[in-house]
């Protein structure tokens, strides 16, 4: 399976084991040679469904910040394949189950967010702007999902218009605030506890392709 792509990266005799993936069209395969993992993942990520270029751009920015993201070994745009570093299975969620101190993990996550907020980097030409339109579209998910659940019907156009008007008012100050990188999917399944790394680098970040 996909032998040429792996062979050109020096991986000849191998076995692939598909691992549980997130809610996306990506598929992840752990690579084994001689029954041992080599800490690399083969990722099939269809560019028509996934933001592959956004992933690469954001990975480069986070690396520039000296944060831990899976190192991209190779990318084949035509075949929609990535070869990336394997962070293993110790997500924050699994780490909590395995007895890692809860305060330690949550403090690490918060300190990582603070560090990103303070980082001085010009993102205007690198990532999409978290615009009013994008923010309102995300707020509208409330009406799309929660409103019908409570009221057993879809919201009227009048309700939608009033909802948008309220959010436009609330977002005025927000849109004038400092422009920073926003991960947009920062939660315990997308954070890894890398115990062999120090300080903020012990927080591994994934699933950041839609960052703004």
Regions found by a protein language model. Give the residues of each.
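ATP-binding glycine-rich phosphate-binding loop
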Residues: 11-32
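Juxta-kinase regulatory segment immediately upstream of eukaryotic protein kinase catalytic domains
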Residues: 1-15
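ATP-binding pocket architecture of kinase catalytic cores
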Residues: 29-137, 175-176
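Activation segment
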Residues: 91, 96, 151, 190-195
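Active-site acidic catalytic loop and adjacent metal/ATP-binding pocket
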Residues: 25-32, 116-117, 167-212
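An alpha-helical support segment within catalytic cores of ATP-dependent transferases
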Residues: 2, 121-128, 133-134, 138-182, ...
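Residue-level detector of short coil/turn "hinge" positions at structural boundaries
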Residues: 13, 68-69, 155
